[in-house]
Amino acid sequence: MNGKKKQALSLLGTGIFTVLGLVYIAPILIVLMNSFKKKVYINKEPFTLPMEKTWNGLENYLTAIDKYELLSAVGWTVFITVGSVLVILVCTSMCAWYITRVKTKFTKALYLLCVFSMVVPFQMVMFTLSLVADRTRLNTPWGIIIIYLGFVAGLAVFMFCGFVKSIPLEIEEAALIDGCTPLRTFFSVVLPIMKPTYISVGILETMWIWNDFLLPYLVLDLNKYKTISIAIQYMKGSYGRVDMGAIMAALILAVIPVIIFYLSCQKHIIKGVAAGAVKG
C-alpha cells in the first residue's frame, strides 16, 4: 500500500512539474512559431503552427537584421557581457581572497560593505547613476563595464569569500616558501581551486548582463550604442506601429544564445553555489 502511495505521489509530482514546465516553455514556443509567419497572420492565428499560406521563411529574421541593425546590437551586447564578466571575475575573486586572508578592521569593513550593497535597491540609485554616468563619460560600453562591476561586486565577493575559507592555508604557505609572490600564488594556486565558483558566478552574471535592459537604457548613449534588449524595444514604430514578425525573430535571436549557454552550464551553478555558501 505504501509503495502504491509513493508511486501515485511520484506520478502526481511529475505531472505537476510537467504542466509547470509547459507553462514556462509555451511563450517561447509561441514566439518561435510566429517568427516564421507572415505579419498579417501573427495576430489572426497566434497559436497555430506556420502552414503553407502563413509561412514566411526567414524573411522576418532578415528584416530584423538588415532593417533594424540587430547584428550591431548583438555585437555590443557580446562585448559588454564578456568584458563585464571577465572584469567581475578577476577583481572580485582577488578582493575576496584579500578580505579572507588579511584580517584587519579595513577588510572586515570592506566585507560588510559588499554584503550591504546586495540589499540596496537599484531603483534607489538609478537616476543619480544615469546623471553621474553622463557627467563622467561612463555612458559607453567600456564605462558600463565598470558600473556592472560595482553592482555585482557584493554578491560575487560574498560567494568567493565562502569558497576561499574552505581552501587550506597551508597550500598557499607552501607556495610562498617555494618563492612564489602573493600575486603568483593567487593565479597559480588559488585560482585553479576556485574554478567551481568562477563558473557559477560567470554563468549567473552572463545571464543577467545579456538580458539586462534598464541599466544600459539609463547609462548608454543610445545614439551610438544599443544592446540587443534596447534594439528590440526600438523596433516599435511611431503611433504604436509594430512589425511583429521582425520582433518575434529578434526575440528568438536574443534568447537562443543564453538558453544554449545555460543548458550547457547549468550543473555548475549548483556546484558553485554549494561550494561558495555551504563550505563557508
Language model segments and positions:
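A hydrophobic, multi-pass inner-membrane permease signature
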Residues: M1-G280
